[in-house]
Amino acid sequence: MAETVSPLKHFVLAKKAITAIFGQLLEFVTEGSHFVEATYRNPELDRIASEDDLVEIQGYRNKLAVIGEVLSRRHMKVAFFGRTSSGKSSVINAMLWDKVLPSGIGHTTNCFLSVEGTDGDKAYLMTEGSDEKKSVKTVNQLAHALHMDKDLKAGCLVHVFWPKAKCALLRDDLVLVDSPGTDVTTELDIWIDKFCLDADVFVLVANSESTLMNTEKHFFHKVNERLSKPNIFILNNRWDASASEPEYMEDVRRQHMERCLHFLVEELKVVSPSEARNRIFFVSAKEVLNSRKHKAQGMPEGGGALAEGFQARLQEFQNFEQTFEECISQSAVKTKFEQHTIRAKQILDTVKNILDSVNVAAAEKRVYSMEEREDQIDRLDFIRNQMNLLTLDVKKKIKEVTEEVANKVSCAMTDEICRLSVLVDEFCSEFHPTPSVLKVYKSELNKHIEDGMGRNLADRCTNEVNASILQSQQEIIENLKPLLPAGIQNKLHTLIPCKKFDLSYDLNCHKLCSDFQEDIVFRFSLGWSSLVHRFLGSTNAQRVLLGLSEPIFQVPRSLASTPTAPSNPAAPDNAAQEELMITLITGLASLTSRTSMGIIVVGGVIWKTVGWKLISVTLSMYGALYLYERLTWTTRAKERAFKQQFVNYATEKLQMIVSFTSANCSHQVQQEMATTFARLCQQVDVTQKHLEEEIARLSKEIDQLEKIQNNSKLLRNKAVQLESELENFSKQFLHPSSGES
């Protein structure tokens, strides 16, 4: 027989294809699970992926891992049933081209035997509930092992692993299950649940020397109740016995055929009449096994004593094998893989929906984030532009306010200087011309003037300055408010309280009047010095009096050291002193030479003109006036003179610092307003920083969302590709006829 490709390869190819697809599907769902989990657990991406999505896709990953393991263990399974000694083991051996299972006289299968291939070169068996691999070298050894194990009952399963190298049929993921006779047990339901639910094909091995028995029919009726239209083949074994009675062969064959057709079509209703004829065969398993063993040994197939009609029976057995292989491969592919294929499509649909929902949520949030980022960028630009404009306006406003304050302080201080005499007159303290008392008196007077002028200036300026500052601060705050968040606007008065501002005038009268020198020595109003002062002025009188009272050759004292001078003018330089000395010496020489003569002449003229009485009266009045002034020159008079001198001196000094004090006050106001504006600018800077951070966060979020969109699209494309592969698998293996049409 020419070698052809076995139909069983169809299952092998299908298993390989579906296993590869499920491997890709598991990899895809695992990748999708990691993607959804990373998206769900990202704290910056809220509500993009839900916990339900994560739980669902992780559940699919676990299910696919289990399905993958199940698929790797999937194989085609054919179960052989029949009465005891009907030749079930012989049929299996004939299909395997070797005597794998014990059969023949003295050998009955006392438990379920599962024959499958192993990649090793040694046969072994494993009993149910044990992982021990028991070595089996020969069939007789296998038979002995089965019969010697007293624990093996009819409902037990023994796995027989036969080297694939010795049997071609076992290379294609086919498992053959031999069973005890259906007439030896009443536990048919247990058998069916345990061994038949995953079988792809059932083979009823009947003895052609008798008809179908009720025990056989009863078993398959129960199978039909548990499975939907099971694939059942009927082998009428030992058909070689009909060769001894050739005249009855066709009648017996027709009789068996009719009963088998009735059983499959009418009773079980699993196939149509035309299909049923292809499920019923008349064979001799023993003949086929012997001929195939001869062929394997290089001997002729027809060698030995064979009954007549062997070739026909051999051909029918081969037809059975061909039909069986086609049926089981199609059936196994459908039963083993169709539901998994449908489940895979459902999983892909669900995962696609999850990816689509993530993609849509990411797209919506990305659009929202982009719009929000644009708003934040616009607001940041607006704040920066407004701050540039407001800074110029605030600088201008501060300049106006400081100039206004400087003018107010200058005017108020000028007025207070004019009223300095009143302030000095209000001062009361112990006065005495002694130096120690005068020192204390001057110190207290300086403090009184400083406190009084400071208080008066504050009364006149502080309220107006405060009102102006508060108004300006409120204007600045109102202008900056729109640049701040609502939460900061409500707390703005707490962050920047509008407190009362007190100007510090810092007159420092003690230091200002530290070089004041009082002149409280008694001076007669009609005395020579007073008259000279009155008519010549202080400077000229000083020069004249200095010239008359000094010796000619005496070096003149520095003007700064004159105790009687009300003020201390600056000492002349060396050249001026020398010039003054020469002039005085010349004048004194001339005056001294003429004084005596002048007095005598003037006195004589007056004496002759008015007489001595008038002179006496005049001298008496002059003396009385002198006496009056001398008596009234009391301590109080000295204090009044001291205060007047101090007022004149302090007025001159205070007028010198009017501009400085006003500038100092305006600087204080400028600092206060600048500080307030700086605090507001800090809040604006914080707002700008928050905006910049928010823009950076949104940009990062947008990039992440874009990446999520791209990843979800890539994963979805993989899902579509896997769907296409599943569809191709369905067309190629599950529905080949529809695919061809």
From Swiss-Prot:
Recorded family membership: Belongs to the TRAFAC class dynamin-like GTPase superfamily. Dynamin/Fzo/YdjA family. Mitofusin subfamily.
Superkingdom of the source species: Eukaryota
Annotated region described as Part of a helix bundle domain, formed by helices from N-terminal and C-terminal regions, given as residue ranges: 9-73, 338-364, 703-734
Region G5 motif, annotated ranges: 266
Region ranges (G4 motif): 237-240
Intervals, Cytoplasmic compartment: 1-584, 630-741
CDD domains per the UniProt record, alphabetical: DLP_2
Domain Dynamin-type G intervals: 72-321
Cellular compartment(s): Mitochondrion outer membrane
Binding-site list for GTP: 85-90, 237-240, 284, 286
Notes concerning its domains: A helix bundle is formed by helices from the N-terminal and the C-terminal part of the protein. The GTPase domain cannot be expressed by itself, without the helix bundle. Rearrangement of the helix bundle and/or of the coiled coil domains may bring membranes from adjacent mitochondria into close contact, and thereby play a role in mitochondrial fusion.
Posttranslational modification: Ubiquitinated by MARCHF5. When mitochondria are depolarized and dysfunctional, it is ubiquitinated by a SCF (SKP1-CUL1-F-box protein) E3 ubiquitin-protein ligase complex that contains FBXO7 and PRKN. Ubiquitinated by non-degradative ubiquitin by PRKN, promoting mitochondrial fusion; deubiquitination by USP30 inhibits mitochondrial fusion.
Function: Mitochondrial outer membrane GTPase that mediates mitochondrial clustering and fusion. Membrane clustering requires GTPase activity. It may involve a major rearrangement of the coiled coil domains. Mitochondria are highly dynamic organelles, and their morphology is determined by the equilibrium between mitochondrial fusion and fission events. Overexpression induces the formation of mitochondrial networks (in vitro). Has low GTPase activity.
A Pfam family annotated for this UniProt entry: Fzo_mitofusin
Membrane topology (UniProt): Multi-pass membrane protein
Membrane side Mitochondrial intermembrane: residue ranges: 606-608
Gene that this sequence comes from: Mfn1
Coiled coil stretches, renumbered: 371-408, 677-735
GO MF terms held by the record: GTP binding; GTPase activity; identical protein binding
Protein name: Mitofusin-1
GO cellular component: mitochondrial outer membrane; mitochondrion; outer mitochondrial membrane protein complex
Region named G2 motif: 108-109
Catalytic activity: GTP + H2O = GDP + phosphate + H(+)
BP term (GO), one: positive regulation of mitochondrial membrane potential
Principal subcellular localisation of the protein: mitochondrion
Alphabetized UniProt keyword annotations: Coiled coil, Developmental protein, GTP-binding, Hydrolase, Membrane, Mitochondrion, Mitochondrion outer membrane, Nucleotide-binding, Transmembrane, Transmembrane helix, Ubl conjugation
